[in-house]
Amino acid sequence: DTARRQSEEARFYLGMLARLLISAVIEGDRRVTAGFEQDVRFPQDRTPEELRILWETLSDRVDRKLGELPHRTEVEKARREISDRCRAFAEKPGGVYRLNVPTGAGKTLSSLRYALAHAALHGKSRILFVAPILAIIDQNSKVIRQYIGDDSLILEHHSNAVQTGLSQNELDERELLVQSWDAPIIIT
């Protein structure tokens, strides 16, 4: 009985290993094909130096746009202070942190500043924005896209993410990115 159970367990694990290897081969084939045919570049294809430059460039872009915002009222000054503290907090090691501030306090841009600076300082290959409610994802996505200024760097992956007006190559590239979450900034 023990020998039979061990044999079944061994077959199960061998089956799982075979599935893993087949998945890796298929994923590798898709990447090579996409890279060759469509000139798709994945985040892990970027060198650490290229990623650092990307994050620093985006961080500078966001800082520049934020610098253009007025900060005359007390609310505007408070938003700026929260944002600056989040940016400074990026030097801390990675972890799970909470940002508890009231509605309208600038959480999206404050967390974006933190994420970009943290990614640059700590060699991260991607940034994930995760929210439990689609309305929040949609709202944050619009703000992030506006400040990043390059939709090709952002992947939205949720049930409301519908792409219109894209060519077949762009749709194929997006599908590949969705399957692997290989975009520098992922919103889900």
Predicted regions and their residues:
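Post-Walker A helix-loop "phosphate-sensing" segment adjacent to the P-loop in P-loop NTPases
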Residues: 117-126, 148-152
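Conserved Walker A/P-loop ATP-binding site and its immediately adjacent core
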Residues: 124-147, 161
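Walker A/P-loop
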Residues: 92-118
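Pre-Walker A (Motif I) flank of P-loop NTPase domains
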Residues: 92-99, 124-126, 182-184
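Conserved pre-motif I regulatory segment
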Residues: 63-100
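Inter-Walker segment of RecA-like/P-loop motor cores
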Residues: 150-188
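N-terminal accessory nucleic-acid engagement/regulatory domains that precede
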Residues: 1-69
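Catalytic cores of nucleotide-enabled group-transfer and carboxylate-activating enzymes in metabolic
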Residues: 59, 106, 112, 144-153, ...
